[in-house]
UniProtKB/Swiss-Prot annotation:
Gene transcribed to yield this protein: ACBP4
TM segment ranges: 12-32
Domain (ACB): residue spans on this chain: 90-178
Glycosylated sites: N175, N216
Name of protein: Acyl-CoA-binding domain-containing protein 4
Species per Swiss-Prot/TrEMBL record: Oryza sativa subsp. japonica (Rice)
Membrane topology category: Single-pass membrane protein
Length: 336
């Protein structure tokens, strides 16, 4: 009898647990459905409201009491506007100055060469910027002088170069601005003399735009070309064939000048051993030793000195090799 009651009690407990679990499951399902229904039935945003663009926000009040809109941006940008005006005026004055100089050159006005070089360097900085061109050969004296005038100005600002250019023109021609092309009266006549030379006119055509002779082979003897190229076998053949070792080109340069300028030490040795005149001067009065110093070829200079090159010979500018050479070249102090 007691065993029956225990079985009945166990069955009742199990039934209650089962009923509790079922009820819990049902309540969970119902709650989940209610949540879904709540989400689905939530009121959407009105399409008309969503599609209507928001009115633009009113501009903030200006700090000057509401008068900001009447300034047309002239308040904060006034400095940059003035800079633009100043830059334009400087450009025009520089253009007028360079055009005036071009016209002066065309009319044959004489200007010191040093001033020409100064104008050239400033013009190149103003129109092209810092010098990046390779240094010309020492054989090209004018080209070398122009390159130095440009190169020594370094990274000078364009505006500064323009202003200095104008200052030099003012010093050379105090009254040039009286007929300046900044007034745009006779500009067409002035610019026509220079328009084919550059965007703002040349400095002095005789210096700035002179085409330098680059050693045209048609103007050189075969031995000059061989010395220039460092072709030692060809040099030996020319000498063996009886070619004059001191043969001059149109500029008075000997094969030794060419070999030194191009830095061909072996060619220099062959020529000096063939009794080349180490003191021969070109049309500018420069010897092969001048070339060695100007081109900073110390080993060749020392070789020439050993072959009794004269360090006291002056070129047309009155410069001796000893005056031009670096102080570190001690062998120069022992020469002659």
């Amino acid at each position: 009898m007691g065993g029956d009651w225990q079985e009945l009690a166990q069955a009742a407990v199990i039934g209650l647990l089962f009923a509790f679990l079922v009820a819990k499951l049902i309540s969970t399902v119902i709650a989940f459905k209610e949540d879904n229904l709540r989400i689905t039935r939530s009121t959407p945003t009105s399409p008309s409201a969503a599609d209507t663009p928001a009115a633009p926000a009113p501009p903030p009040a200006s700090l000057d009491g509401g008068h900001g809109d009447t300034s047309d941006g002239s308040g904060s940008d006034s400095d940059s506007d003035w800079e633009g005006v100043e830059s334009t005026e400087l450009d025009e004055e520089f253009s007028a100055a360079s055009a005036f100089v071009a016209a002066s050159a065309a009319s044959g006005t004489s200007v010191p060469e040093q001033a020409q070089l100064q104008l050239y360097g400033l013009y190149k900085i103003a129109t092209e910027g810092p010098c990046t061109a390779p240094q010309p050969s020492a054989l090209k004296l004018k080209a070398r002088a122009k390159w130095n005038a440009w190169h020594k100005l370094g990274a000078m600002p364009t505006e500064e170069a323009m202003q200095k250019y104008i200052t030099v023109v003012d010093e050379l021609f105090p009254n040039w601005s009286m007929g300046s092309s900044t007034k745009r009266k006779d500009e067409d006549t002035t610019v026509s003399a220079s328009s084919s030379k550059g965007p703002m006119g040349p400095v002095f055509s005789s210096l700035m735009y002179e085409e330098e002779d680059q050693g045209n082979d048609s103007e050189l003897g075969d031995i000059h070309v061989s010395a220039r190229e460092g072709a030692i076998d060809d040099i030996a053949k020319h000498l063996a064939a009886g070619v004059e070792v001191n043969m001059r080109d149109s500029e008075g340069r000997t094969p030794l000048h060419w070999a030194v300028d191009r830095g061909h030490l072996n060619s220099v040795e062959i020529l000096v051993n063939a009794n080349a005149d180490v003191n021969a001067q070109d049309n500018e009065g420069q010897t092969a030793l001048h070339y060695a110093v100007l081109c900073e070829r110390e080993d060749i200079a020392e070789l020439l000195v050993k072959h009794h090159a004269d360090v006291q010979i002056k070129d047309e500018d009155g410069n001796t090799v000893r005056e031009l050479c670096p102080s570190s070249w001690s062998f120069m102090n022992l020469a002659n």
